[in-house]
C-alpha cells in the first residue's frame, strides 16, 4: 500500500500507527488530528521509532484535510472516548458530527479510498459512514470483532493455561453488551472448548468478553483500551494492504445475510486487496440466531436514534 491516513491522533490512532509504521504496512503514513501540532509530534515520534526498527515507512502528521489526498485507506479513530460508567452509545451525540466532518473531507480529497471506522459507537458510525459515502459495503466497514475475539482468546488462555496461539474464537453482532460469542466455534488445538471448560466457566468468559472494554476503562480510570485496538487495526490493514484474503470479523453492512438488511453488524468477512471482498454467512442454531437477532434489534434502535439527531 502506498499511502494510509489515520484520522485521530489519540491513543488508539497512535498505537495503530506505531505497528503500521514498524511493520512497514504502507510506504507513507499520515497521522491527522484537529490538534495539528499534536499529530505532528506523535508522527515524528512514531517515524523515529520505525526507523530504529529498520522500517522505511515515511510518517508525517498535521491537521489539514488536504493531507488525505492520495490515501488508499483511511482509518477513522477520531472522537471522544467513553468515560467510566458510559456506554459506547453515550458518546454518539459528540462523535457523530466529528465523523460527518471527516467523511466530508474524505469525499472531497480521497473519494476512492477504503474507509475503516474504529470510533465508537462503531456499529452506528460505520453505518453512517457508509450511508454518506456513496460507496459500496466493500469500501466502508468497521473494526470491532478482531478486538472482541482477541479478548475472548485472552480470557480462554487465562482460564485453561493453554497457549493463545492454539485458540480459535469467533464473536458476532454488535460491539457491546449484546455481542454474540459463538462458543461452538471456539476450539483449542482443534478440540472443542467444552472439552476443557464447564458451561459455567464458558459463560463467565462470555460475560467478561462482553464487558472487556469496560473492565479496562474502569481499571485505567483516565483512558480506554488502546494497545489491543491498535493491534486489531494493524491486522486489518495488513490483510487489505497485502491482499491476504484473510477471514476476519468486521462491522459490515448486511444485505440479507443472517436475515438482516440495512444494518451494520459484526460478522466474519474476507478482507482482500480492495477492502471487504465478501461476508461469510455461517449457519446458526436457534439459540444463536435468537441472540444475533437480539443484538441486531439493539443496533437497529441505535441507528434509529442516530438518524433522529
UniProtKB/Swiss-Prot annotation:
* Pfam families the UniProt entry points to: Ldh_1_C, Ldh_1_N
Q: Which PANTHER family match?
A: L-2-HYDROXYCARBOXYLATE DEHYDROGENASE (NAD(P)(+)) (PTHR43128), L-LACTATE DEHYDROGENASE (PTHR43128:SF16)
Which InterPro entries does this chain map to? Answer: L-lactate/malate_DH, Lactate/malate_DH_C, Lactate/malate_DH_N, Lactate_DH/Glyco_Ohase_4_C, Malate_DH_type3, NAD(P)-bd_dom_sf
The EC number(s) attached to this protein equal: 1.1.1.37
Which GO MF terms does the UniProt record name? Answer: L-lactate dehydrogenase activity; L-malate dehydrogenase (NAD+) activity
Q: Which gene encodes it?
A: mdh
User: What keywords does the record list, in alphabetical order?
Assistant: NAD, Oxidoreductase, Tricarboxylic acid cycle
The record's similarity note reads: Belongs to the LDH/MDH superfamily. MDH type 3 family.
Which species expresses this protein natively? Pseudomonas putida (strain ATCC 700007 / DSM 6899 / JCM 31910 / BCRC 17059 / LMG 24140 / F1)
For the biological process aspect of GO, one term held by this record is: lactate metabolic process
Cross-referenced NCBIfam families, in alphabetical order?
PRK06223.1
Q: What class of enzyme is it?
A: oxidoreductase
Source superkingdom: Bacteria
* Residue numbers binding substrate: 82, 88, 120, 151
Q: Which reaction does it catalyse?
A: (S)-malate + NAD(+) = oxaloacetate + NADH + H(+)
Q: Where is the active site?
A: 175
The name under which this protein is listed is Malate dehydrogenase
SUPFAM superfamilies attached to this UniProt entry: LDH C-terminal domain-like, NAD(P)-binding Rossmann-fold domains
Please list the residues that bind NAD(+).
Answer: 8-13, 33, 95, 118-120
Q: What does this protein do?
A: Catalyzes the reversible oxidation of malate to oxaloacetate.
Amino acid at each position: 500500500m502506498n499511502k494510509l491516513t489515520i484520522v485521530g491522533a489519540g491513543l488508539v490512532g497512535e498505537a495503530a500507527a506505531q505497528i503500521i509504521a514498524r511493520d512497514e504496512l504502507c510506504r507513507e503514513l499520515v497521522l491527522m488530528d484537529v490538534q495539528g501540532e499534536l499529530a505532528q509530534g506523535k508522527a515524528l515520534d512514531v517515524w523515529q521509532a520505525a526507523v530504529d526498527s529498520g522500517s522505511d515507512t515515511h510518517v508525517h502528521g498535521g491537521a489539514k484535510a488536504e493531507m488525505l489526498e492520495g490515501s488508499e485507506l483511511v482509518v477513522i479513530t477520531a472522537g471522544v472516548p467513553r468515560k467510566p460508567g458510559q456506554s459506547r452509545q453515550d458518546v454518539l451525540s459528540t462523535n457523530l458530527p466529528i465523523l460527518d466532518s471527516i467523511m466530508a473531507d474524505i469525499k472531497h480529497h480521497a473519494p476512492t479510498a477504503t474507509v475503516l471506522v474504529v470510533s465508537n459507537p462503531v456499529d452506528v458510525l460505520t453505518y453512517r459512514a457508509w450511508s454518506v459515502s456513496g460507496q459500496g459495503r466493500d469500501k466502508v466497514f468497521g473494526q470491532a470483532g478482531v478486538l472482541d475475539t482477541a479478548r475472548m482468546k485472552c480470557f480462554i488462555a487465562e482460564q485453561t493455561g493453554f497457549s493463545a496461539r492454539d485458540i480459535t474464537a469467533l464473536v458476532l453482532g454488535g460491539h457491546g453488551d449484546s455481542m454474540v460469542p459463538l462458543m461452538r466455534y471456539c476450539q483449542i488445538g482443534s478440540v472443542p472448548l467444552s472439552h476443557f471448560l464447564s458451561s459455567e466457566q464458558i459463560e463467565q468468559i462470555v460475560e467478561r468478553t462482553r464487558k472487556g472494554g469496560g473492565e479496562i476503562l474502569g481499571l485505567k480510570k483516565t483512558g480506554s483500551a488502546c494497545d489491543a485496538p491498535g493491534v486489531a487495526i494493524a491486522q486489518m490493514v495488513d490483510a487489505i494492504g497485502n491482499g491476504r484474503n484473510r477471514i476476519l470479523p468486521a462491522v459490515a453492512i448486511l444485505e440479507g445475510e443472517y436475515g438482516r438488511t440495512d444494518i451494520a453488524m459484526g460478522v466474519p468477512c474476507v478482507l482482500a486487496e480492495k477492502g471487504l471482498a465478501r461476508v461469510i454467512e455461517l449457519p446458526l442454531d436457534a439459540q444463536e440466531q435468537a441472540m444475533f437477532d437480539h443484538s441486531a434489534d439493539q443496533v437497529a434502535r441505535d441507528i434509529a436514534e442516530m438518524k433522529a439527531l
